[in-house]
Amino acid sequence: MKAFDRPALTAILVEGARGLSLTLSEAQITKLIDYLALMVKWNSVYNLTAVRDPLQMVTQHLLDSLAAVSAFAGAKNVLDVGAGGGLPGIVLAIWAAEAEPEMRVSLIDTVHKKTAFLTQVKAELGLANVSVHTARVEQWNAPHKFDVITSRAFAELNDFVNWSGHLLDEGGEFIALKGVAPDTEVAHLPAGWKVREVRPLQVPTLQAERHLIFIERG
């Protein structure tokens, strides 16, 4: 499927969410598909993702991010580092607007064309719980600390922690979205940090290993 068949894509998203035991409202489903449509439109010019087929985008981007959202329950200030096209941050924000209404999601990337896309998504989808920042995370003076810092396909764990550790609040944690369990990366975590949990994820219709890595001070 290369054409943007909205009913078919919606059906796959709804079925996948059911497989994740997630209940999405009609408004959330509409916004997720609207986000996908924007990604398809902008991708042809801005090269946001190597995935070109909207059907594959539902599984590899939307459902892959939705599989992780429950791990963020209770978080108030979340930072998505190297946000790129908005994964998992935009998906998390769409979910949180109803599921975790006090959550705020900040997206940071160094590439202006990517943050321009994210700013457009925020505006078109009316995501009041999202802020977008163009900066290098290691040099960024954020207006506040974050209780959760996340990333997907951003960097090795030691770099992720070293570059953004100054932005993590006391008692906060990193949640990294990874493919195969990164045992070597875990072994090379810098001093002062420890892995609290490595959690396998099952993403409907995705035949690939996915893991969440929870890192805290210790």
Curated annotation (Swiss-Prot):
GO molecular function, one term: rRNA (guanine-N7-)-methyltransferase activity
UniProt keyword terms in alphabetical order: Cytoplasm, Methyltransferase, rRNA processing, S-adenosyl-L-methionine, Transferase
Gene Ontology cellular component annotations, sorted alphabetically: cytosol
Xref: InterPro entries: rRNA_ssu_MeTfrase_G (IPR003682), SAM-dependent_MTases_sf (IPR029063)
Family: Belongs to the methyltransferase superfamily. RNA methyltransferase RsmG family.
NCBIfam families: rsmG_gidB
UniProt name for this protein: Ribosomal RNA small subunit methyltransferase G
Organism listed in the record: Herminiimonas arsenicoxydans
